[in-house]
Amino acid sequence: MYLSLRLVSLALCIAPLASAGNNSTPLVQACTGYSFPRVACMYRYASKMPLDFYRKASVDISNVDTYSSTEVANDDSFQQVGKATFLVWDQQRGSEILGSDPAYDIVFTISTGGHEAPVYVPDTNELWFSELGKGELHQQVISLDGDSPTISEVLTDPPLYAPSGARYRNGKIYFSAGGGNSTLEGGPYHPGIYSVDPKTRKSTIEVNNYFGWYFNQVSMPTAHTRGGSPLSHFCTLVDPRLVAHGLTFQHRPTTWILTNTVASGLVILVSSWTRDLTLVHTDAAIVLARNHGTSTVAPQVQASVYRYDPETGAVNIVDDTLHCPNGVAFSPDYKTLYLTDTDAGVPMIDPRVPLSEVPSLQYNSTNRRTVYAFDVSEDGSYLKNRRPIYTAKDFVPDGLKVASNGYVITGAGKGVDILDTTGTPLLSIQTNFTAVNMVFGGKNLDELWIVGHGAVARARLNLTGPALE
């Protein structure tokens, strides 16, 4: 009798497992109210696939595998993933983001090199971004006046070399520049944070060293404000080993926070009752910059996050746990700082290897490709409670922004992922180019502009960026 019961129990356990590979419901479905497959709903996050599925992991950074390349032999619906512009992971919240009439279009075709540091300037209704090319000193400027956007080149005075992050605040653009070169015209150039008056094109150095060491890279700035608060801004600048980018402003009492990574990244937190500015910067990009030719110097300091006080000039370390900090942004209430770790991009950092022999960036999908969240202390002086919230489904989470409602947005491979505060995917925008960074622009901050390798795109969704000062 006992043996019979054991056998029955075993049979009951095996039965569900035997049927687990047979999905009766298609993984990819039409979404109510939208055209299919342009908008595709993923059934239960496609977390249970028929057993005969396979995704090949690429090690070629020029041809990284994508989610849509997954082979799902026993579910023909999955072929629609590659045809979709929008992938909806959470039907209720994803549909709320899409709104009634979502739009996506390629506005400009540009060179296939890396493009970074998009920033919207409300004073002039312009969108600036950079080209991370060897010896490239011009910035790209898109005018949003008129019926159709136009694009032109601008040379600041002095020039900026390889900015990988930017934020706007109080009439100025704050760039995190990652280029390092002593012989390039107009130089020498060193990674750091530079401010630019978008009307006069004049640039000014804000910070460019850590006790005499070059920052590896400065990257991706972002700005935030808190209306009516007496606290100052916290500006975060992140710079991964691949490229420098990451800068954000937050209302916080009197400090700047900087991050510095072996690859790229300097985070600066600036906060003052009178100055009202906080910068966070990560420094790691020199490593990456050296691999793509925009820096001639090997990394000198470890990947870290620092606090910088603009009143005294003091720089203090606040985090050194990320391997390659890159994208950075604050939550709307400034209580959470989000950082990306793009360690899957593997650079050559050995200073003994001559610049002429430094190989291009390598890729390893088993390294970190993660978005992290940190709590910010009440006085804004340190970070705590680090936790991973998302591993990118494609490539690495590069640029990072936070919408006015708190949703986290990251450029990752051939697309942009929109997450809730826990890192759960809600919606993905699929692009036919590598999406590096993005920014909310337009007079109502309701256009998401995406820059990367080969294109500038614009998405119009029911989502807005945080207010600018």
Swiss-Prot record:
Signal peptide region: 1-20
UniProt-listed Enzyme Commission number(s): 3.1.1.-
Gene Ontology molecular function terms on file: hydrolase activity
Pathway per the UniProt entry: Secondary metabolite biosynthesis
InterPro entries: 6-blade_b-propeller_TolB-like, Oryzine_lactonohydrolase, SGL
Top-level taxon of the source organism: Eukaryota
Protein keywords: Hydrolase, Signal
PANTHER family: PUTATIVE (AFU_ORTHOLOGUE AFUA_1G08990)-RELATED, SMP-30_GLUCONOLACTONASE_LRE-LIKE REGION DOMAIN-CONTAINING PROTEIN-RELATED
Known role: Lactonohydrolase; part of the gene cluster that mediates the biosynthesis of oryzines, natural products with an unusual maleidride backbone. The two subunits of the fungal fatty acid synthase oryfasA and oryfasB probably form octenoic acid. This fatty acid is most likely activated by the acyl-CoA ligase oryP to give octenyl-CoA before the citrate synthase-like protein oryE catalyzes condensation with oxaloacetate to form tricarboxylic acid.
Family affiliation: Belongs to the SMP-30/CGR1 family.
Protein name in UniProt: Lactonohydrolase oryH
Phylogenetic placement of the source organism: Eukaryota, Fungi, Dikarya, Ascomycota, Pezizomycotina
Gene that this sequence comes from: oryH
